[in-house]
Each structure stands twice: as C-alpha cells, then as structure tokens.
Amino acid sequence: GFANNPGAFTLSSLATATNAVLQAGGPNSGGSFRSVKIHRNGREIADLDLYRLLRGGKRDGDIVLQNEDVLFLPPVGEQVAVIGSVQEQAIYELRAGETLADALRLAGGANVLADADRMILYRTSDTTNSEPIEVLMADAATRPAKGGDLIELLSRGTLLQPNSITPRKPASRKNAVSTS
C-alpha cells in the first residue's frame, strides 16, 4: 500500500499493528492515517485509525499481529481544512460519517480567542453554491463534513455577513511592486 517503506518485515512475537506501521516508515504522503487495514487469512480483521493514537493516545484497534498477517495502507481519504481560532490549523483526513464538530475536535478544538457560537463553512464541493455558510456550533455535531470543506472558526468579535464575502484577485508582480 501507501507506506514509505513497503515490504515484508520480521517483527517480534509481541509486535502490534502500530509497530509494523512504524517499521514500514508510516504512511507516505498519499497514504491514509485513518484506515490501516489488517488482514489475516485473507480477510480483514481490523481497521486501525492512527489519528486515535497520535491525537488522543488511544490504542484501541492496535492488535497483536500473528505470523503472515498483512497490513495495507490505502490511499488518503477525503480531507478538510480547519483554520482560524483553533489549537492546530491543518488539513485533516475524514472517516465516513464524521461531522463538522469531529473535524473541529481533530484540530484540538477552539482556542481562547474563538467565537464559541459559530463557524464559517466554505463547501468547495458544492458547485451550485460557492457562498460561505455560517454554522452554529450547536448544529456542528449533526452537520456532515465533506471532502474539500474549509472550516473557519472565527475569533470573538469578528463581524461577518457570509453572503457579502467576495474573493480578492491575486496580486500580480506587475501591480504588487510600485514603480514610482
């Protein structure tokens, strides 16, 4: 699969799936952190979410391997970007069924400057409506996140009318430098 160093490895008899992933160098830039498939005797027996270990220290799903087990790192799944007043702005991989609140949790939640009542959703996958959508935090747990979403958590005091945002034209070299 999408490991940095794919191949067959000899591991100790007490090695876990995480040990094997580390031995393989982890997922490469195109590999999933959210769905490491563990196969035994030709059938999938576990699906390890490395985010649970890396972001929360939880080792559930990290089973002890047996001889001839196969780990498969599939390609990265759908991703969302979380920006603004969060603990860790980044692009995060989604698992099926995750919500906007789940994506916010992946980013470490709101920081001390955040407006705790609302977020702005830019749904880039919706070609019929490119307008930003204001989402109340109370609704974030029931609103599904979709690949390509950009979720912005605003700071307290930020004024925003979602339908009034117009993207700025990128500066060109010609008009970015004054020649006076």
Predicted regions located by residue number:
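Ser/Thr/Pro/Gly-biased, low-complexity, turn-/loop-rich segments
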Residues: 1-180
